[in-house]
């Protein structure tokens, strides 16, 4: 039997979020709907999840000692990583001491960089992937590019949102890609993965929920990337029954190997009926923001239920749905928004503004959501709604 206490009392059920961006914010909201006390942690103040949490802490999550001090003081029932850049060795230690890490400390450790999860998927589980090599020095990198061949993609083993990622098409690009990867990783310079091109038709995110009652799959999500970052997503993405079955088989294999309860975003390349594993995140996925409108239970509601050991009944899809990012570019310490009434004027549209306190360069500030009679119609509506929002810097 699951028991949930009352926030801000001795009986409280406490969740501590490591990472307080827009995805963590939605998890916090869903947890609070269920009566959970939420503590939000991030490296900067007034992060989106901090704005809705019961309390918050500002600290570098790569500082294991500082992280330990907060966790020992708060004594959360669940530690919920929402980003990759965390002192995972500390999480492994804390888990051994009796703290619960979602889904597991091992999952957080393996997925904090591309090497751990790629070796698990390709070498231990035997899942098909693109050709790849890892390199830690410039000499190893040149050897890796020669072995994989051109064109190839170079990424820091620890980065997100396309940072430090580039495509090498000619010899002239080789050193530029290395230098860019050394400045774009979350932990500074270091190891990279060199990946060969997969000739795929499209890529999907297969959201997979591991919960007390088993494993549940959301409908496949298609997405559009620009500069390595998500710009649009839609659900359901049409695909053959054979490809869908193989996608779910692979998703179940890799999430089962990682273990624990929660939602996983499994990224896959599809070529005809063939499926290739790309990456997995043991947490809500940015492309899954579309589920705020596309499903009766969003990926965030599913994550909260799974974490708490609550039932996840059959999912209901609300029909063709899409999301489109509201993007800002420039510098501001107090951004504002106009055009919201125009964005929400069409039927079956929605808007989620993330409340990010600062903009420096390009930043994802919100997402427009839409339902339609077809995926094409839903995407067009979401794009119109996003375009109507003006971010004042």
UniProtKB/Swiss-Prot annotation:
Enzyme Commission number(s) of this protein: 6.3.1.21
UniProt KW Cell membrane keyword: no
Catalytic activity annotation: N(1)-(5-phospho-beta-D-ribosyl)glycinamide + formate + ATP = N(2)-formyl-N(1)-(5-phospho-beta-D-ribosyl)glycinamide + ADP + phosphate + H(+)
Signal peptide: none
PROSITE patterns reported in the protein's UniProt record: ATP_GRASP
Gene3D superfamilies: 3.40.50.20, ATP-grasp fold, A domain (3.30.1490.20), ATP-grasp fold, B domain (3.30.470.20)
Domain of life: Bacteria
Functional pathway: Purine metabolism; IMP biosynthesis via de novo pathway; N(2)-formyl-N(1)-(5-phospho-D-ribosyl)glycinamide from N(1)-(5-phospho-D-ribosyl)glycinamide (formate route): step 1/1
UniProt entry keywords in alphabetical sequence: ATP-binding, Ligase, Magnesium, Metal-binding, Nucleotide-binding, Purine biosynthesis
Classification via InterPro entries: ATP-grasp (IPR011761), ATP-grasp_carboxylate-amine (IPR003135), ATP_grasp_subdomain_1 (IPR013815), PreATP-grasp_dom_sf (IPR016185), PurT (IPR005862), PurT/PurK_preATP-grasp (IPR054350), PurT_C (IPR048740), Rudment_hybrid_motif (IPR011054)
Domain ATP-grasp: 119-308
An MF annotation (GO) of this entry: ATP binding
Binding site for ATP: 114, 155, 160-165, 195-198, 203
Gene Ontology biological process terms in this record: 'de novo' IMP biosynthetic process
NCBIfam families registered for this protein in UniProt: PRK09288.1, purT
Subunit structure: Homodimer.
Role this protein plays: Involved in the de novo purine biosynthesis. Catalyzes the transfer of formate to 5-phospho-ribosyl-glycinamide (GAR), producing 5-phospho-ribosyl-N-formylglycinamide (FGAR). Formate is provided by PurU via hydrolysis of 10-formyl-tetrahydrofolate.
UniProt record similarity statement: Belongs to the PurK/PurT family.
Name of this chain's protein: Formate-dependent phosphoribosylglycinamide formyltransferase
């Amino acid at each position: 039997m699951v028991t949930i206490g009352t926030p801000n009392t001795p009986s409280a059920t406490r969740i501590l979020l490591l990472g307080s961006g827009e995805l963590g914010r939605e998890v916090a909201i869903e947890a609070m709907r269920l009566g959970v006390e939420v503590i939000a942690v991030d490296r900067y103040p007034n992060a989106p999840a901090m704005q809705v949490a019961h309390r918050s802490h500002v600290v570098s999550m790569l500082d294991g000692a500082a992280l330990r001090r907060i966790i020992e003081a708060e004594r959360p029932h669940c530690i919920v990583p929402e980003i990759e850049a965390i002192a995972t060795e500390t999480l492994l230690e804390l888990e051994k001491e009796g703290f619960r890490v979602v889904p597991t400390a091992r999952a957080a450790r393996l997925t904090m960089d591309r090497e751990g999860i790629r070796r698990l998927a390709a070498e231990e589980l035997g899942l098909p992937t693109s050709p790849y090599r890892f390199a830690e020095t410039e000499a190893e990198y040149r050897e890796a590019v020669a072995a994989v061949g051109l064109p190839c993609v170079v990424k820091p083993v620890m980065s997100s949102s396309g940072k430090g990622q580039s495509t090498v098409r000619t010899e002239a690009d080789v050193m530029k890609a290395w230098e860019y990867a050394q400045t774009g990783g979350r932990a500074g310079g270091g190891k990279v993965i060199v990946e060969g091109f997969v000739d795929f038709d499209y890529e999907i995110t297969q959201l997979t929920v591991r919960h007390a009652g088993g494993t549940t799959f959301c409908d496949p999500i298609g997405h559009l990337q620009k500069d390595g970052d998500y710009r649009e997503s839609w659900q359901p993405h049409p695909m053959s029954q054979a490809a869908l079955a193989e996608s779910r088989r692979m998703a179940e294999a890799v999430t089962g190997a990682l273990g624990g309860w929660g939602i996983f975003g499994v990224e896959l390349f599809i070529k005809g009926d063939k499926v290739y594993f790309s990456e997995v995140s043991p947490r809500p996925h940015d492309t899954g923001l579309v589920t705020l409108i596309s499903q009766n239970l969003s990926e965030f509601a599913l994550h909260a239920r799974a974490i708490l050991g609550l039932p996840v009944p059959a999912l209901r899809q609300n029909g063709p749905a899409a999301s489109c990012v509201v993007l800002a570019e420039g510098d501001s310490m107090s951004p504002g928004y106009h055009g919201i009434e125009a964005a929400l004027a069409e039927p079956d549209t929605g808007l989620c503004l993330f409340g990010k306190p600062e903009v420096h360069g390009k930043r994802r500030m919100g997402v427009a959501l839409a339902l339609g009679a077809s995926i094409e119609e839903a995407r067009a509506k979401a794009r119109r709604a996003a375009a109507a929002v003006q971010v004042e810097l």
